[in-house]
Amino acid sequence: MWLLGRDLVHMVRIQCSFSRNQAYVFLGHSNFEIFSYVINGYLEHKDSMSNVEMLKRGDVQFTSAGTGMRHSEFNGSSTDPVHFLQMWVHPSARDLKPNYQTRSFTEEDKLNQFCLIVAPNTGETQKSVSINQDVRVYASLLEKDKEMEFKCDTGRFYLVHVCDTGGKIQLNDVSLDGGDGAFIEHTDRLRFVGKNETAAEFLLFDLA
């Protein structure tokens, strides 16, 4: 497990791999927005709100802990590891009613484009997970020599995480391998170029 990034709207980003039979066992939390992005394998979720679900690659699972809840994550396979990212954000208001959401995104949804997977709870999209904070998260799969440009607000902050799936990208003038991350501020655009035969999977965080 690695703690990465910096404290932007009190966000913690955790990259996890569980081998078979590994788990987080019933952790108790309140006043956190917690979402998991499954990269490979199967992740089993259980919580004190009676939610039980098996998550696979492409799934995003979200829990707003609000006034308080308990949850656990297990490797859902007895033979293969699971690799996922879990992000924790303090909500814009305290002691909200706990809630649970899941969304699924295909490879085509992310291929050579920015797929919005997490957005503020303002009704701007029905497909993404709704979060109680001014945060947007995009997922992408960028093929070799393909280019994408993201227009930025110079007053916001941006975080890029490249998933460790074999791909590489060039972000502006910086090369990023799998597992690498970059923090960007005071910019009006980000330029991404795929640099490997394997499509690069990455997440882009747009933060207040």
Language-model features: locations:
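Jelly-roll (double-stranded beta-helix
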Residues: 1-208
